[in-house]
Amino acid sequence: VQIRREGAGTFLIDPVGIEDRLGPLADVMATDQWILHAADQDLPCLHELNLYPPEVFDTEIAGLLLGFPRISLQSEVAEVLGFGLAKEHSNSDWSERPLAPALLAYAALDVELLLDLRDELTKMLERAGRLEWLREECEEIRLRGPRPPKVQPWRKAARQAGVKDQRSL
């Protein structure tokens, strides 16, 4: 979990193995707007950790509403703030523990510019008359419940063939 708080710095928290001890973090995080990129991808994982935002600002949706040709975080930071983000670790294996120092640095850099990006996107959305649209979209994503379990089509075919489990296929 990557956290950047104005005046407090950047924090990286690996919740693996401490999922049941994140209550104090949840209490602190329940007081501020969360700035996320592609919130609909992050929130389900954060909900599994009992982390719920009181308000969301999704930079990806902001980019869509502003008609940006590319809406990756890297593209938006370059277009709006004029900085290039290194993305050489985006396809790394994040399941290996402990995380390598290079991966930790990469994860921290991902959130370093989110406050500035939010501020500039907010100004742009206000000028375009679309800030309220963003608020509505972000609230819908924030309130969205957990995703239903993925359909596993092999189960239906397996039942018809008398197969009891996936391994028997």
Question: Could you say what each language-model-derived stretch is?
Answer:
Residues 101-169:
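Mixed-charge, glycine-rich, non-catalytic linkers/tails in nucleic-acid processing enzymes
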Residues 73, 87-88, 125, 132:
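Secondary-structure transition/capping residues
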Residues 48-49, 85-86, 144:
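Short, flexible segments with low predicted structural confidence
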Residues 1-75, 79:
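Conserved RNase H-like, two-metal-ion catalytic cores of nucleic-acid enzymes
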Residues 56-57, 88, 115:
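Short beta-strands and strand-loop turn motifs
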Residues 75-103:
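A short, charged helix-loop
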Residues 51, 66-67, 81, 85, ...:
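Hydrophobic/aromatic-lined pockets within catalytic cores
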